C-alpha cells in the first residue's frame, strides 16, 4: 500500500524578509499568493520601502511504499513541514525549477514539489522566527535562502544530495534530526535545543580546502561573541578544539563538518554545524553558561546567532579566499585551546617493535591545515586529524595504527 504525506515550503520574498500580508489572492499558476497592499513592510514597528513583497506557497509531497508504524521509528518515515524563506526573485526561480525537475532527493524517500493551499501552514513561528532571523541577517550571499523544518533526517544530507537544486549559500536548519552527521561517519546527537544547520558553497582551490573548517570554527566563536556584545551580556569562554570541535569549560558544545565532491573543476562543499544552545544534555549549553555568568537573563536566540554566524563567515571567507589563511591565523590561535600545549605523542619506533612515547609541543598549523608540533630536539611532527586519536585534555595523542 502506498501512502502520501505532505509537507510545505513557503517562499517569502521581501527585501527586509518581513511583511504584513493584508490579502490573499489566487495567482495565475494555481498557487496561493499573498501580497502587501500597504506601501511599507513593517519590521518591529519600523517602516521601510516595500519592494515586491510576495509570499508563495509550495508543498513537498512525500511518497512512501509502507505506512509508518505506531512506534517511535514512524517519525523517521516522514519529512514534516519544510519552509523556505528568501528575499530575491533569484531563489524563487530555483523553487520553480524544483517543480519541473520533480522535487528533492532524500534517502529512501521520494519528494515531489506540488502546489497546495496556505491552510496547511500553522504556527511555524513558534518554532523558528524567520522574521527575527532575516532582520538580523546582513549578508550578500550566505543564508539568504533558508530552509527550515521541525524534523529532518539530516540538514547536511538534504543539501549535499540536492546541492545543485539551490543557489550557493543556501542554508537548512532543523529543530531536531534523527540522522545527524559527524566526522568519520559518526552520528551527531540532535536533541531539541541544539542549533543544527548546514549550508553550501563552492571552491576551486583544493589545496586550501582543509583549512575551510578552521574559518567556519572561527566564525562560530566570533558570532557568539558578537551576539553577546550586542546584548551587553558577558562572553562565555568558548574555544576551538582542533580540528573541528567547539568547547566551553572543558566540555564539548558544538562541532563542524565539511564534506565536498569534485566536478567540473570545482569542489561542491556542504558545511554542517551543531551547537548546544538550549540543551544542557549531554554536556552543557551556551545559554546555561550565560545564566551562570550573570543574574540577568541574556539568552541567545538561535535566529540571532545563525544570522550573526553567516555575517561573520561571509567576511572571514572573503579574507581567506583573497589573502589566504595566514591572514586569519593569529585570530584563529587566539580562539583555540592548543598554543604551546605540551602533549605526549605515542607512535611506533623505527623498528616497528612497539609504541614509542615522545613529548611534543604544539606550534600551530601547517600550510596544509594539519597540526604542527616539535619535540625537544626540534624535530617537526605533522599530525593528521584522521590518522591520530587526540585527547588534549589528558595531554595525549595516539597514532592510529593499522591492524
Regions found by a protein language model. Name each.
Residues 1-230, 396-403:
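N-terminal lobe of the biotin/lipoate ligase/transferase fold
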Residues 251, 353-355, 376-378:
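Glycine-centered tight beta-turn/hairpin loop motif at sheet-sheet or coil-to-beta transitions
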Residues 378-391:
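A short macromolecule-binding patch
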Residues 365-370:
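Short, conserved beta-turn/loop elements at beta-strand boundaries and strand-helix junctions
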Residues 371-375:
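SH3/SH3-like beta-barrel fold
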Residues 293-358, 363, 392-403:
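Conserved, helical-rich catalytic subdomain that frames metal- and/or nucleotide-binding sites
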Residues 175, 243, 250-255, 340-342, ...:
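Conserved beta-strand residues within beta-sheet cores
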Residues 163-165, 187-304:
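Nucleotide and nucleotide-moiety/phosphate-recognizing core
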